[in-house]
């Protein structure tokens, strides 16, 4: 139980530190000025590697390009984050996309379709009532 609690604490510290590094220190053009959220970090049991799950707000550059830039900058990000989170061995960072924006976009498009259908039905009902008058 204590190991689980310790692991959660280390994951949270890594998440916060990696987010700070990406926000303040990374100068890659496909990373800086992007809305990147570190949704969670999952450290391996041997503490040698960490899965870093990110959510990237859609932008003119594709999310895949931004993810590729994060992967390319993983060494730099780990080096900078290791100054903040002191561990015996700092884990290798592996970035993965966690798409939290798609469900919202999908719901928004469904609502727009419903609104369009409602307009059509209202328009058709108005036309049919005019014919009967």
UniProtKB/Swiss-Prot annotation:
The lineage of its organism: Bacteria, Pseudomonadati, Chlamydiota, Chlamydiia, Chlamydiales. Keywords: Cytoplasm, Ribosome biogenesis. One of several proteins that assist in the late maturation steps of the functional core of the 30S ribosomal subunit. Associates with free 30S ribosomal subunits (but not with 30S subunits that are part of 70S ribosomes or polysomes). Required for efficient processing of 16S rRNA. May interact with the 5'-terminal helix region of 16S rRNA. This is Ribosome-binding factor A. One of its GO terms (biological process) is maturation of SSU-rRNA. One of its GO terms (cellular component) is cytosol. It holds the Pfam family RBFA. Belongs to the RbfA family. Gene3D superfamilies: 3.30.300.20. It is found in: Cytoplasm. Coiled coil: none annotated. GO terms for molecular function: ribosomal small subunit binding. It comes from the Bacteria. InterPro entries: KH_dom-like_a/b, RbfA, RbfA_dom_sf. Monomer. Binds 30S ribosomal subunits, but not 50S ribosomal subunits or 70S ribosomes.
């Amino acid at each position: 139980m204590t190991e689980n609690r310790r692991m959660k604490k280390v994951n949270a510290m890594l998440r916060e530190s990696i987010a700070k590094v990406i926000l303040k220190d990374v100068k890659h053009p496909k990373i800086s000025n992007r809305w990147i959220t570190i949704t969670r970090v999952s450290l391996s049991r041997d503490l040698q590697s960490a899965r870093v799950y990110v959510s990237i707000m859609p932008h003119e550059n594709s999310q895949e390009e931004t993810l590729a830039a994060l992967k390319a900058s993983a060494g730099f990000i780990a080096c900078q984050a290791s100054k903040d989170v002191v561990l015996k061995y700092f884990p290798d960072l592996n970035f993965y996309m966690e798409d939290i924006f798609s469900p919202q976009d999908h719901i928004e498009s469904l609502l727009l379709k419903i609104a369009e259908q409602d307009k059509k039905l209202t328009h058709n009902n108005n036309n049919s009532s005019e014919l009967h008058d």
